[in-house]
Amino acid sequence: MRKVLLTGFEPFGGESINPSLELVKQMASRALPQVEIIGCEVPVVRYQAIETVLQAVETHQPDLVLMIGQASGRCAITPERVAINLDDYRIEDNAGHQPVDEPIIATGPAAYFSTLPVKAITHALQQAGIPCQLSHSAGTFVCNHLFYGVQHHLHTRAIRSGFIHIPLLPEQASASNQPSMSLETLVHGLEMMMMTCLETEQDTKHTGGTIC
């Protein structure tokens, strides 16, 4: 039995829901063959987010950690390729923190790559007709903060980990005419992502770069 830790954020920025948390709740109640799914709600708070996920890692000892976050304006599921050592918050987090141009970990390197097979994930979802695009920037808010912090602590351990951004849900996006994706499609996509991660030892070679 393999263990998968799924993390999703609480609502922030005036929203009443967060699609990442709704997705994690849905997935935690599902049964997949030979896979135990563990859900974890993450506060949108600097450093507390990292501590919450690392505590869950130590408690459950997962084989795979998939961190999920909301990305307003994106129309596809976007596996993140790299986390950078920078906090530069455009808005306050849920505890009122708003660091500007500060490192996440002062002694850490400039960046960490995801250890997920991000190109295999992207290709698998695209082949299934689910909008998916490789991303090279997780932003500079709490999503990137969590991504970097977890990679910093897990990069020497045999636990695959990485971050996935997802679009808004239709009920969030309707008022502002932003892109969205149904929860049903997100659930199907996340199931495919999990199985791709568990079944792919080495990432595949598919074009996923950008010109700018």
Curated annotation (Swiss-Prot):
Sections of the chain in a coiled coil: none
Source superkingdom: Bacteria
Residues the record marks as active site: 80, 143, 165
UniProt-listed HAMAP family: Pyrrolid_peptidase (MF_00417)
Keyword tags: Cytoplasm, Hydrolase, Protease, Thiol protease
DNA damage listed as a keyword: no
Catalytic activity: Release of an N-terminal pyroglutamyl group from a polypeptide, the second amino acid generally not being Pro
InterPro entries associated with the record: Peptidase_C15 (IPR000816), Peptidase_C15-like (IPR016125), Peptidase_C15-like_sf (IPR036440), PGP-I_bact-type (IPR029762), PGPEP1_Cys_AS (IPR033694)
Biological role stated in the UniProt entry: Removes 5-oxoproline from various penultimate amino acid residues except L-proline.
Enzyme class label: hydrolase
Name of this chain's protein: Pyrrolidone-carboxylate peptidase
Localisation: Cytoplasm
Organism expressing this protein natively: Vibrio vulnificus (strain CMCP6)
GO biological process, one term: proteolysis
Entry's family note: Belongs to the peptidase C15 family.
Pfam families cross-referenced by the UniProt entry: Peptidase_C15
Enzyme Commission code: 3.4.19.3
PROSITE patterns for this protein: PYRASE_CYS (PS01334)
Entry GO CC: cytosol
Quaternary organization: Homotetramer.
GO terms of molecular function: pyroglutamyl-peptidase activity
